[in-house]
């Protein structure tokens, strides 16, 4: 009987509502990633019990809601200031840097590991002047995705340190 009472208490404790996440922020912006005049939507959010342990998510959807690009990582990798300025940070992060693949560095200027593509594919994408979206992937690094209209998908193009972007 004593064990039954303990089991009942444990079961009740397991059913107790859990505390909601304390680092939940979101920002949304429109972007013209897939083509000029497109109504693509960038949504960024954080999810976690606190901002030190939160995950940051970057998602791009076409106007019809079709998901075309995502990136996620630890929030502290992007922003280490804590919860006070997280919403303001997300507002800035949602402002995608939109350009074209012709502005990407030439193959010979890439460091090993900056792209997962082979040389022929990288140079073909660069020469085709496709839409390109870049956003932060850490406090000092950004990731760039290209849009392939023939396939209707976005793909990882390359990553670069911020000091090499300007």
Predicted regions and their residues:
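Short, solvent-exposed mixed-charge patches
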Residues: 164-166
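Positively charged n-region of N-terminal signal peptides that target proteins for export
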Residues: 1-4
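Post-signal peptide N-terminal segment of mature Sec-exported envelope proteins
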Residues: 22-40
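Short beta-strand elements that form the blades of beta-propeller/WD-repeat-like
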Residues: 36-49, 128-135
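C-terminal motif of bacterial Sec signal peptides marking the signal peptidase cleavage site
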Residues: 12-14
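Mature extracytoplasmic domains of secretory-pathway proteins
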Residues: 52-54, 59-126
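Bacterial signal peptide processing site
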Residues: 16-18
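Short, exposed beta-strand-loop hairpins at the edges of beta-sheets
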Residues: 133-159
